[in-house]
Amino acid sequence: MLLDLNRFSFSVFLKEIRLLTALALPMLLAQVAQVGIGFVDTVMAGGAGKEDLAAVALGSSAFATVYITFMGIMAALNPMIAQLYGAGKTDEVGETGRQGIWFGLFLGIFGMVLMWAAITPFRNWLTLSDYVEGTMAQYMLFTSLAMPAAMVHRALHAYASSLNRPRLIMLVSFAAFVLNVPLNYIFVYGKFGMPALGGAGCGLATMAVFWFSALALWIYIAKEKFFRPFGLTAKFGKPDWAVFKQIWKIGAPIGLSYFLEASAFSFIVFLLAPFGEDYVAAQQVGISLSGILYMIPQSVGSAGTVRIGFSLGRREFSRARYISGVSLVSGWMLAVITVLSLVLFRSPLASMYNDDPAVLSIAATVLLFAGLFQPTDFTQCIASYALRGYKVTKVPMFIHAAAFWGCGLLPGYLLAYRFDMGIYGFWTALIASLTIAAIALVWCLELCSREMVRSHKVV
């Protein structure tokens, strides 16, 4: 049977569900808060005007592409730390965490420079009104300054979650979400003596929130008694290029996979610019709501990575394979809820972002497409996270490349422009690409986990 789901008793299945839930639920709530920050940005920008919403849509697409790609690279820390923790290598856990912080800081600085360099080419490439162009540039400048803090935060996030302490992440994320609301209000609309920055104010709020999150999570870990034996904050460690090389080897394919998936969504925003601001704004609604729901498989997948990595560290290879299957089944059950939510409530959901009739009409149809790809999106996400627990990252990268670009973005462009399907052509192709990715990744996980069990002669 697929992933040996019939290997253990139903009581073991329920136990694994409980363990996954204990990890995934705080991660989910943390994701709710983090994605909610983007939701607040979109709503606040929409309240300032259609042009501000379009500017934030373009600027956030650029920021999200860099952030998500680099976040994927930092995700290498999860299986590394989880496997060390499972093997009982306490000192190595702390040292790997320190090196992760160094690596995140350097990566974040590079991301900041990269975003600075991208501002002028974007302004020259896109045909936009002066207001949208200027607001987009300001937004990108502000969010670029968030990159170093964002990557340090991801290192600390991986450290805490891999040691089965996601509650700290949840608390910091909710504090950041609460802080983001008044900051957006002040910067976007010009309150308490601040100038009204419009959509650019969302970028300034994002910068402040990321720096707060990194500092708060560091303080939590330093003060929490559970973390003291690992010694993350007990001493200063110099950058270790050997560890950096290991992080890069595992993380670079993950980052590229993230980029390929994120760019398939984000790049569509730029390709839709010639259709007009209504389509760009509607696309942002679709991306925002899809992102909010995507946090569910991400949370289940992250929990699966930790549980699989921990089991492999303990050399429980058959258990790791079983956990992979339980993670997928959990995702399939949850996908039913998200499908129904998007299909049944697509019009009210779209109206939360903007009240322009043209935008609402397009966005409601876009959300119907988003609902249709939920099951396959959940599947490909959780399967790729499970493979990450095995430190298998290159094959998923190639699968994502073929699926999202070869079967998604390029056919979507043809459907949109050659067959006059417009925005719906892109979403049709995305459904096909996610389906292909899901099938390929599940099959890869089946083969990888089975071979791991066989090679270690686990009965």
Where do the protein language model's features map onto the residues?
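Short alpha-helical transmembrane segments in multi-pass integral membrane proteins
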Residues: 1-24, 81-148, 194-252, 308-373, ...
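N-terminal alpha-helical transmembrane segments of multi-pass membrane transport
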Residues: 2-5, 16-18, 22-35, 47-53
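Transmembrane helical elements of multi-pass membrane transporters/channels
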Residues: 22-41, 142, 146, 176, ...
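Interfacial/gating helices of multi-pass transporter permease domains
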Residues: 22, 45-64, 131-135, 199-200, ...
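Helix-terminus/linker motif at the lipid-water interface of multi-pass membrane proteins
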Residues: 32, 36-54, 123-130, 186-197, ...
